[in-house]
Amino acid sequence: FHISGARGRLHYEKSAADQHGIPGCGKGGREMSIKLIALDLDGTTLNSAKRISERTCVALETAAKQGVHIVVATGRPFAALPEDVFHIHAIRYMLTSNGAAITDLSSGEIFYENCLSAGTVEAAVEMLKSTDYILEGFIAGKAYIEKAYYEYVERTGKSFRDVRYILETRNPVENLNGFLLNHKDHVENINVNFEDLACKPGLRDMLLTLPDATITTSFPNNLEIGGSTTSKAEALRQLGKKLGIRREEMLAAGDSPNDIAMLQEAGIAVAMGNGEEEVKSIADYITSDNDHDGVGEAVEKFVLKV
């Protein structure tokens, strides 16, 4: 193994991991038992076709039969979750909108919410209303977008991201800014999307001046505004308390900057082979990419011990 990253965490290549027998060991090399697996979706559990591979499905179902909790932790709102996650019976808890809500699928109960404050929503709308960025609002589990942009995507087949995903998961409204203000007590996230990557640094600096807000990103062409304490990590902490599971008993996997805090919260942090370098730099293990069963591989190695 070799040491890298600002925190000096151990990065194990596959051959070194096998050689040194690390599966099942937490930070510090102590033998541990994983009781909860937290998984990002896009770029992690989902492959490029937005499906969950058979190997990963089998690994998750097998882990669940051994009593391990399988948790989705995604930047998507609940209504935008792919069908595949509902076909895996092992998955019970959904952490959505970057941790703004936790839903128990067994009962349909949303037992945790951490939305933006009304004041932050007002400030964000005021800041962004004169810009031409493409805005999305996640409100009570649904995603909303300007009707004019939605119709543009329908008409041209062009979008800042997957066209089919936009048309199937976004709800068009006439005036998104007004809609956000009318629902300012229930806004989970505001996403700012752009086509020119050169805009990102300046836009990020601007958004960082918002009061009581967290700014993160899940793919190159966006920035995401959440509440001051909203994150996948905080939601995972709250779920751990509810289930009586310590952070040392958790494994988390992700690929993007909005996964970093969650990976740092878990006993074993797994970065995808296709993940961004800043994610890989804080991981305990770098697995295969999302098109080569990276999640299934990590679950087999650290949980199933195969």
What is each PLM-predicted segment?
Residues 1-10:
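Extreme N-terminal basic, low-complexity initiation segments
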Residues 9-14, 18-31:
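Short, Lys/Arg-enriched N-terminal segments with co-localized hydrophobic residues
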Residues 32-36, 53, 208, 223-306:
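Mg2+-dependent phosphoryl-transfer enzymes with acidic/Ser/Thr/Gly-rich catalytic loops
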Residues 35-48:
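Asp-based phosphoryl-transfer active-site loop
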Residues 50-66, 113-120, 172-177, 227-241, ...:
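Short, acidic loop-to-helix structural element flanking the phosphoryl-transfer center
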Residues 51-160:
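Active-site phosphate-binding/coordination module
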Residues 67-71, 90-92, 189, 248-249, ...:
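Short active-site oxyanion
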Residues 127, 131-133, 138-253:
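Conserved acidic, metal-coordinating active-site core of Asp-based
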